[in-house]
């Protein structure tokens, strides 16, 4: 490449468009003295606009927009941000809970209608970003978050009501459940026909092969708007964020005897697109409530999503210095027991699973599928083949007789997703009588394996995976944060006044990845001092038992708790026009047949 066009400058980031696809225009008011005459001829500058109500752009408009995903994020920042967290904490006091059994200690009457139970779920990528920023371990970053959200020196130290978060969960636990159910889903598609109903009791059929992962909301939003033909291939499982929301809302609602609207769930994620996911109408209590009132307003399973950078803004707004918080676990006096002790042991297990480098930084969906089928086929081995770039990798599980058992792949970044979509695009029917159907033509279709050869594909919108999410702490923010903290690692961070070079940005992402993978060694050291780690098949039994207990205790089928649906999204821009008059229809017809007035 030339010095001007360098591979270091390639990036999938799309800056938000300067013009909205549905702009709000200010037009002069119509003269009420004039009446409409469909046959009146006038000049363009004399046309009076209708007196319409003020235009509003809602989240629904953004979800139905045919523009890029990033344009919607700018609107969502104002709808789900650290300011909303502060406003909610100030508007609603915490419901007092018994520190012995986790039950509500006051009568639920008119006086306490404003009370809320605040819960939070935090992704491991967020902890890795904080650990790299402040030069601490992943475990210490976990302590920092808990002290900030629930401790006496964090959010509870200020605000109108001194409210904080009663329970803070690690999404790794729910991710483990999704991984096990994903392997089950892949196994079902390998042994049954595509149109067969799922054995989990879901009313919908199994996804088509290859199954495409559905945990990345940027990828899902893109598929629903642009390539609806891939929707039958999407995994029906909820993401760990969505599953955590359903888990909290169902268990606490039934155990505490309060409606889901009085449980406020915050998710801290590495990605702005998680705000889009939380706003989906499929991820509300309407999807799992057995008996719904006609006047019932759907309540989100995840009420608000903030990113890692927004958590820094949240702390700054309250005047809290995150690195000055105690880097140790909270005393049990600040954490009441979860109402259901069986689910408490599941959700707050002492050794939450970490991630190995082989699993990647996006949850390890593909890695778990391969490991599961390898455990079910003793003597088999995994053969890895790198694709056109580092974000495309193909895997083949070979039996002891060197015959392929399963093929899978990993596609990160929209550049590579385009190639995957081309492989899955249905063949075009020939317009000539008796002609053969024509396969799609493209670079992605001409090279590599056919998309239908895969049993499972892990798809993520961000190049490099979720540790490189758009909401993560950037190197510029890390420089500013570390410059105010006197630590032994402050010398490793370059001068905050200089613009980071591509090499420095890659080095920063490597530090975040290192912190992310370090969680595995912490988990292993803890587990080694207590008991031997569970095998994959033992983990499957543990997860299946927990999911079965959750479903039975709630009286809700697992198909409603852990699975979701997708839909084709069409742009509604320009479609909400008033019904055309007879004159308009005649004019349109005349224009189509070449006539006129």
Curated annotation (Swiss-Prot):
The keyword Iron-sulfur applies. SUPFAM superfamilies: Fe-only hydrogenase. Transmembrane segments: none annotated. Residues 428-449, 479-505 are annotated as: Disordered. [4Fe-4S] cluster 1 binds at residues 20, 62, 65, 68. Keywords: 4Fe-4S, Iron, Iron-sulfur, Metal-binding. The keyword Oxidoreductase does not apply. [4Fe-4S] cluster 2 binds at residues 216, 271, 462, 466. One of its GO terms (biological process) is iron-sulfur cluster assembly. GO terms for molecular function: 4 iron, 4 sulfur cluster binding; iron-sulfur cluster binding; metal ion binding. Component of the cytosolic Fe/S protein assembly machinery. Required for maturation of extramitochondrial Fe/S proteins. May play a role in the transfer of pre-assembled Fe/S clusters to target apoproteins. Belongs to the NARF family. PANTHER family: NITRATE, FORMATE, IRON DEHYDROGENASE. This is Cytosolic Fe-S cluster assembly factor nar1. It comes from Aspergillus niger (strain ATCC MYA-4892 / CBS 513.88 / FGSC A1513).
